[in-house]
Curated annotation (Swiss-Prot):
Protein's name according to its UniProt entry: Uncharacterized membrane protein C61.05
Recorded superkingdom: Eukaryota
Keyword field: Membrane, Signal, Transmembrane, Transmembrane helix
Main location: membrane
Endpoints of the signal sequence: 1-19
Annotated compartments: Membrane
Annotated transmembrane regions: 199-219, 236-256, 283-303, 305-325, 338-358, 386-406, 413-433
GO cellular component, one term: membrane
Membrane topology, record value: Multi-pass membrane protein
Amino acid sequence: MRINFVLLITLILPWFVSGDSSEEAVDAPLDVKDDTGNKDYYKDSTGAYHFDKLIVTPLEYRDGESWKQSVIYCDLIFAKENKEEKGSFVKAQLKEDAEHPFIYRLLKLQTPLETYRGFIDGKNTEILDEIKSINLFEDFLSESLVPEISPSVNIPIDETALYCFIGIQETEPIRIPWPVLTVEFYGDAPPPESYFRTIKSTLLAISMFLGFITLTWLLRCIKSQSGVQPAQISLAFWVFIFVFTHSYQVYSMVAIGRGSFSTWYVVSFLFSLVFEEGLEQSAYTSFLLVLCFGLGITKPALVKYYVYLAFVAFVQGLFVTFAPLSYPVMSFYGVRGILLKLIWNIYTFVYYGLPFFAVYRLYKQAGESRKLGFEAKYSLLRTCYIALAAVTVSNCLFLGVVRPLLGSQLSLGFQLITSCITFVDFLVFAFLFDCSKFVFLKYQPIPFEWYALESMESLNLEPAPDRKV
């Protein structure tokens, strides 16, 4: 099941629970062992008990003589790619000495924007009614394990991602709340340590490359402010946001999946989870607008353009960040759902068509501007080929390098279909650009010096020989 609103509360819960249930609990010796005889655990400053990758946190209340604890188990699971084999699944089983039911739910960790798209596409809409009717955290945990009736369950997993098994258990009042169940994830064998070292080295190499570019542009800016273009600044900002958010998300997800449940990992992961899409897309849009307007490339960059870019980026960042978080309180049925889906599709396809328009503008300006030193003029057909090749290579690199590091799988066919749709949008943008440019040049007064210079060059006149007086 996919939901992020309750998941955020669930992950934050162990670090903010302030109740102390040990005051009235019956003291037990510290060497209490579970069924397997394992006593490896530790207690953090918030009162949560860590058993390998499983966290047990005493809650602030009790039901009769039984104490309740929240249980969280998170792991990075790699789904099996071989369809002939048995698929990946999660197995949860109560221990033999369990006396009370255990309520639970399995959550797949993903960004709010991905969940938002799923709701608009008609996926997991049944969770909306559950969220609106939730009064307690226990109401969200719809499934249960009952001793001697249904003590175990197998939950299938179809995608590689970070999964969290959450629930509430009831135990007798003892000092150490041992887990009453065992949770095991079955999938492809986890990668060796070299895989995680590769992730760290890749992120380090990208960060060093970005730092070198940023430092170079900073020195150029200090030496000569006219030597740095707005396109370079916006590109550096976008790449910095991309590397920062994805690096923290990947590293935190790997750390959480390996059992390192520190506060820093959780806070950084939640920050990148919520604000990643908004920051990255707003920075990317600013870069595209700088290219489309030609700021600092073919015309001077005025202050009003920067104000406009900042306003557009701010509005888009708010929309992408907070609009997905509104699905728990909104109803996507009826007219409101149709209108929301229409707006979202227009935003998606028009937004992803902007890069083609930016490429077209760059090549047209490169062919017409003397400042860049290009004399050859690029035809529309050649520009289209370059744009289509660029988006294909970008999608392949994105699917082959970035997404595997994030632990998710996307369809290459879907990305290619999206590329074709955005390619058509690019042609429309290019046609509108040619029309607008023709109208602009038709009614724009032409300076005399520029007109005279172009006229002299078009006539190919040779200078007259000097006459002797």
